[in-house]
Amino acid sequence: SSVKDKLNPFHLAIPVSNLEESVAYYKDTLGLREGRSSNKWADFDFFGHQLVCHVSDSINEQITNAVDGEKVPVPHFGVVLSIEEFEEFLSQINDKNVDFIIKPTIRFKGEIGEQRTMFFKDPSGNAIEIKAFKDIGNLFSS
């Protein structure tokens, strides 16, 4: 069985400075389906996982760590897609003025963990990574 067959939906709540702006970004820019919401939070179907944006006066500071020659933002969250899903998502956001931190690239080329990856920020500065392994079976391989 594949990794995807074993997964339960993950829940992640993130701070946002402006809920209306965040809802527009996650729906219109990233194409996510909005679920329930109030005037303080909104949840989204993030590739089968529950992402909740909560209004907050305090947004976390970020650092970067070097990974395969790139400055990767910490903290960040994201999803592992198939190569086909990665390409489809990339084509969906291609003309949406996404604020890339790391433009779509191949990381660890020729190694066990070879993957397509991209990093971008939402309007509140939350860093998001979308990636796809050349071989999903190597997700946890070293």
Task: List the model feature ranges, each with a label.
Residues 127-130:
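Short glycine-/small-residue motifs
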Residues 18-19, 82-85:
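Helix N-cap motif at beta-to-alpha junctions
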Residues 22-27, 93, 125:
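Conserved active-site tyrosine of GNAT-family acetyltransferases
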